Every structure is written in structure tokens, then in C-alpha cells.
Amino acid sequence: MLEHLKFDNSFDKLGSDFATRVNPRPLVNPKLVCVDSKTCELLGISKDSVSSENGVNMFSGNRVPPQFAPLAMVYAGHQFGGYSSQLGDGRGLLLGELNTHSGKYDLHLKGAGKTPYSRFGDGYAVLRSCIREYLAGIAMRGLGIPTSHALCVVRGDNAVTRETIEPAATLTRVARSHIRFGSFEYFYYTQQHTQLEQLADYAVEQYIPEYVDKDGRFNALLHYTTEQTAKLIAAWQAVGFCHGVMNTDNMSIIGETLDYGPYGFMEAYNPTHICNHSDTYGRYAYDQQPSIGLWNLNALAAALSPLIDRDQARASLESYEGILTKEYNSRMTKKLGFLSAKQGDAKLINTMFIQLEQLQLDYTLFFRLLALAKADDLQSSFIQPLLGCDNIAKGEQLAAWAAEYLTRRQLEDVPQATITADMNHHNPIYCLRNYFAQQAIDEAYQQGTYSTLEKLAAVLAAPFTSHPNASEFETPPPSELANIAVSCSS
């Protein structure tokens, strides 16, 4: 079945200024780790075909069918605020673009070996980082947040040196685009303005085709990216997601979450939470993500400056905050069960965040329990499950806030049971805590089995519904294991 996939390798047609043809370096003795059935459905292929010997060989670099056109894409980027003039795909290859019933998707092989852009790297990916990206794509899709996906993970017998010796692996990423803000920066800063325009025209054709050959199409591209980025980061903030490395080379031109490295979902609420322990100064802390999104868009606008009208570009960038705020407020009111705006809502929500921070409440658990809170039994329905029996005394102010909140919620002209049900569709039971991801990784490394990975992936795929025999993923880890910061090592 994989032999009959329809590829349209349009990026390859742009030429050698944009990417370099490279064949993947095969994994030694490849073995399948996992396959995501939802991504198979997205692509219109069977899970069995991916799991077959032929599929494992294709997605481990051991077999390159004629439909593939493996490319290492060139790009640059601002990393932690400093410009890096040439980055590019140092260990990943765009295998091709697959036409499906739901649109065109890139297939990208992470861990494909050295490329001209590897610099001092070995081009491999480790199993740990591939498992983390696999789970992240499933989790974000389950939450309804634009994201890349992972089709499968394959491990090999190759040993890779990071902080320790780890097994090599490949991950087949599926995304609507791998064009990054840094793709445009590369051509701008090298003064290759002809290629810059070619890339911009290509992006217009692929993602906003209604503007092809029209005046102002490049301003339309900037506005489109601004809008999609604002909505994406609003969604991150609403679920407590921290990306960790919001460099411009990790920002998708179409506003999908891309390049899952040292990410983390916030556990105990802390607006200044840092998930990447290499982020010494907190540039990419949770509360900085909205402003960094705008910073990155300004960098993109600078890269597009030879092609765009400055006043229109300024207007697009100035629209960012309003778009983000509107999207964030929409998501938060759904989490709170508010169907309409009322006077006093802003103060009520502000007090809520103060309580969350002061009591270090678990962000995901708080909102899920809030849907179940009952005015006539606040202690047992909300306070005790949230704080635990030993900490109820600390919840006096929280109980007062919850009573005020429930009074406000009752102003909605629908039955409370309906509101509770709706809140449960917007507040997940399960979130991808780094502690859980590490359990899956430990089992894979120590035992060579993947039962925790499979079970965790299943609950993350449908996070708003209770899963039998998965209660271990419903509650936060011990406090000393919460909010684990991880590194960029992968």
C-alpha cells in the first residue's frame, strides 16, 4: 500500500538554493516502537502497512522508494535572541509531500543522519526525544491545538552519545509545512532577494492560494502568519503549554506547533514557569510566550521587508495582541463555563489566578474539578480533592472564591448540568506531564517494552474522557517530581 502513495514534491522543485538532496543514513537493525493510528487515518494509510517490514525499513532510512525526494532544508534563525546565519535540517530530511484526502502533508524523517547543515552534530536522534515528540503530537491534537504529528518511531542498535550513551531512533513527522520564520531570514540576511521572493510566492501558493499573483500577496502572507501564530500561542496559554525553545527557526509559517524539544505542560501554576533548564534567564518562560511570539513576527516582517508595504506590515503586527487576547479569552470562558460576558468577570478571573499561584494549584486538575464543584458541598466536591485532606485549612480564600464563581456561573440561562458537561469538553482529565513521559522512556530504555507509552498515548488521544484502568494518569505526580525541566539534548 505504501508503494502507491501519491507524492507531490513541490518544494524540491524550488531548486538547490532552498535545500540539498541527501539520502538518509539507515538505522542498524531497525525495530518498530510505535505507530499512531490517527496519523495513519490522516494520511489514508493502514497501520499494518507502516508496521510491516517494508514500512519499518522506509521509516528508518533503510529503504528510499522512488517517490521520496529526501531534502535537507536550509534556514537561519534567531536563537535566544541572537542571530544564527545558517542552521538548516541538521538531522532531519523532508522525504516528500503526500497528497491525501485531507490535504497535502510533509513527511519528515527526524534522525536521518548527517546533512550539510549538521555542523558538529552526528545527525542522529535518540529514542528519548522521539518518544517525547510522538507523545506531544498526540497530546496537542487531542486538545485541539494546531500541531505536527508523528506517524511512527523506529529504534536501532546504533549507540548515540549525548549526556549518556543512548539508542538511536527515527521519528516520521507529519506536518502541513516545514517552512519556518527562519527560512525567510536566511535569504534576507544573505541578500538573496530573488530567492526570498520565490519562497514567499511558494508559501502564498501553498497556504493562501486565493492571493496568488495578486498585489499585496506578501503582506497577506505576513498577516496570515500573524493571525495563526496569535491563535496558536493563545491556545498554548489556555492549556498551560510551554514550548521551551521559541527560536524563529522553530516557528511554523502556518501557526502549527513544531519542533518539540524541552517542552512541558505546566503543573503547579507558576506564570514564570521555565520548562527548558538551558533557558537561564527565562526568555521562553510561560508568561513570556505571547510577547516572544510578537518578537518573532517582527523578525519575520524584517525578513520580508524587501517585499512588503511597511505600513500594512505594521498594521498586521499591531493586530497580534488583539487576536491573541480574543482567542485566549474565548478559550478561558469555555473552561470556566461562561456563555456570556458579565460585569465583574475580569476581577473574578484575576482573583482565580492569584489563588492558583499562591496555593501552587495544579493547573489541569483545578479546571477539571471546577466543573464538578457544588455550592452546597464545596469542601468535598472541590476543595478537598484539589488540596488534599491535610491542606484544607489553606483553602479558606479559595472556598470563598469558588462560592463567588458558582454564583456567577448560575447567572447563565442554561441548566448547570449542561454547563458542567460543556466544561468537561474543554478541561482535560489527562495532560502530558513530563513525569509520565519519563516513565514511558524509562520502560523503553530499561526493559525494551512500550506498554506505558501505548497506554499514555491512548489517554492523551482522548483527554476529555475517562479511561478505564488509567487512573495513574489522572492525578499530579509527587510535588518533588512535578514541573520537571528538561534539556534541549536530543
Swiss-Prot record:
UniProt-recorded Gene Ontology molecular function terms: AMPylase activity; ATP binding; magnesium ion binding
Top EC group: transferase
Region forming the signal peptide: none
Family annotation (Pfam families): SelO (PF02696)
Obligatory cofactor(s): Mg(2+); Mn(2+)
Active-site residue numbers: D249
Domain of life where this protein originates: Bacteria
Keywords on record: ATP-binding, Magnesium, Manganese, Metal-binding, Nucleotide-binding, Nucleotidyltransferase, Transferase
Protein residues bound to ATP: G88, G90, R91, K110, D122, G123, R173, R180, D259
Enzyme nomenclature, EC number: 2.7.7.-, 2.7.7.108
Positions that bind Mg(2+): N250, D259
Catalytic activity: L-seryl-[protein] + ATP = 3-O-(5'-adenylyl)-L-seryl-[protein] + diphosphate; L-threonyl-[protein] + ATP = 3-O-(5'-adenylyl)-L-threonyl-[protein] + diphosphate; L-tyrosyl-[protein] + ATP = O-(5'-adenylyl)-L-tyrosyl-[protein] + diphosphate; L-histidyl-[protein] + UTP = N(tele)-(5'-uridylyl)-L-histidyl-[protein] + diphosphate
PANTHER family linked to this entry: PROTEIN ADENYLYLTRANSFERASE SELO, MITOCHONDRIAL
Family classification: Belongs to the SELO family.
Physiological role: Nucleotidyltransferase involved in the post-translational modification of proteins. It can catalyze the addition of adenosine monophosphate (AMP) or uridine monophosphate (UMP) to a protein, resulting in modifications known as AMPylation and UMPylation.
Protein name: Protein nucleotidyltransferase YdiU
